[in-house]
């Protein structure tokens, strides 16, 4: 390993390791479920997941994602309690980060270390040992199309990264009592996160460029052939953009809804909603996950830890 690679490695979080035995994998899973439940203040992650899907069965079927003006905290809580996604305008566009260009980002923050997803990360999106490449942000922004990815592979993608230098340039609304740190998603047209769901409420801010997002309600998971990546993250092999109903016949019963997010948009994705995200242009996005009982379940006292 080169000196530069060692230096970058020390500035980035360690890569996850695979369990060496089934027993170790089971023990890790149990410990992770307990940690996740404690952080969210719920009696059980499994019970929370089932409650999310149960609530979703009572919701109307969406044919489009509502676009509304920004809400104050009280208005957001009331709307989000329905358990349906919606998009807000008039908030993110005021962030200082939105005024920066890619050139500005390179000049001011190019020395930040980043970790890019490389190879065919779309087919193996949530595998713990999927290929990654560490580099400086400036190096990533300077990449030429096709330089480090092969034919048929998507472009390298800086996804789900903590870029702490950028946090002061984003003014997140105080919609939740507790939230995880901001995560950043940077990449050219064609970068993608395949269909999956997080069992945490999610705020997704679009900084630059446009992205196409498909959303599917939580209770349609029975049609999506889900795979558990961790207790609060499930992936699906089904692609709503290019549906293969021969391989996934049950997916005919799923009802995805599409939305295009543009610079300045803030999308609320309720816990448990499946979503697939593809960049239509060179894009920068940021998101934060809430760390608590989903707003749609606030009145379900049986889920709260004593």
Model-flagged regions — what are they?
Residues 1-266, 274-306:
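N-terminal accessory scaffold of Fe(II)-dependent oxygenases
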């Amino acid at each position: 390993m080169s000196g530069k690679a060692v230096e970058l490695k020390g500035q980035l979080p360690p890569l996850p390791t695979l369990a060496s035995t089934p027993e170790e994998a089971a023990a890790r899973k149990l410990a992770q479920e307990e940690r996740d439940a404690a952080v969210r203040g719920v009696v059980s992650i499994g019970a929370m997941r089932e409650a999310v899907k149960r609530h979703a069965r009572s919701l109307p079927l969406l044919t489009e994602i509502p676009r509304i003006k920004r809400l104050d905290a009280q208005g957001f809580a009331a709307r989000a309690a329905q358990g349906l996604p919606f998009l807000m305008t008039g908030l993110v566009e005021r962030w200082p980060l939105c005024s920066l260009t890619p050139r500005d980002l390179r000049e001011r923050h190019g020395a930040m270390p980043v970790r890019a997803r490389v190879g065919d990360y779309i087919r193996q999106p949530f595998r713990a040992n999927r290929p990654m490449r560490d580099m400086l942000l400036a190096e990533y922004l300077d990449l030429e199309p096709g330089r480090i990815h092969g034919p048929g592979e998507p472009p390298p993608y800086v996804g789900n990264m903590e870029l702490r230098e950028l946090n002061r340039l984003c003014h997140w609304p105080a919609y939740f009592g507790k939230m995880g740190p901001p995560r950043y998603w940077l990449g050219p047209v064609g970068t993608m996160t395949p269909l999956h769901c997080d069992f945490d409420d999610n705020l997704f801010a679009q900084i630059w460029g446009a992205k196409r997002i498909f959303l599917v309600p939580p209770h349609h998971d029975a049609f999506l052939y889900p795979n558990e990546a961790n207790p609060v993250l499930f992936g699906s092999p089904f692609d709503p953009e290019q549906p293969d109903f021969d391989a996934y016949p049950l997916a005919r019963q799923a009802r995805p809804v599409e939305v295009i997010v543009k610079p300045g948009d803030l999308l609320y994705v309720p816990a448990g909603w499946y979503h697939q995200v593809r960049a239509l242009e060179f894009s920068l996005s940021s998101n934060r996950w809430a760390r608590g009982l989903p707003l749609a379940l606030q009145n379900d006292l049986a889920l709260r830890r004593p």
